[in-house]
Amino acid sequence: AGCEASGLMAWESDPTENTRPFQIKLAARNGVTAALLAQDGFGGPAEIFDRAHSPLNAFSRNPTAERLTHQIGETWDGLMELAIKPYPCVAFLHPGLDALLELVDENDISADDVETLTIRFPKSGIHCIEDNPLKSHSAPYVLPVTLARRQLEIDDLFFDARNDDPKIAELCKKVEVVADEAELESLFPDFYATEIVVRLADGRTLSRRKDIARGY
């Protein structure tokens, strides 16, 4: 019930990962519901953002209501900041997933073929993906699952694939997360530039770099 409060970030400590997508969908549902109710004449406090018990006061010590209407109808920053994710995980991992899937498809790589799987990521953002208990934010989990299954689905985050698939569990042990302090770091945070390096059992080493998180 607590996680139904708009803007609450408690999902960061939810090991089930159910509440993160749940909250986003609630926001979308509530916006549509409010519009439909208003269309049918449903009433409410007209000064919802101006009174003492406004949502702005509930979530901020220094609310600035004027930002809600600043240049409204002239600029579309809110819309331009929306993202359409091709993968149900943190956006930091998206360029790496694009690179990994290209290598997997081009070389027909399976979990059994891999000796090591390395991701190079900007040092300033690596804390988010290196050893994160949330599966959706963990490179050592997301990359092996995506390689083994050639896709990443929301159920892969709700249910731990390591418990059901020994090959994925073993592959997770072969992941190395490396902090880049040079070129990739210089592009962060405007770009989530990532390099993926896959060392195969046949002696080949394959690499691919992607700089852009598609949909952002």
Describe the residue ranges of each PLM region.
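Long, well-ordered core segments of solenoidal/helical folds
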Residues: 1-9
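Terminal-appendage/accessory-domain detector
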Residues: 11-30, 36-216
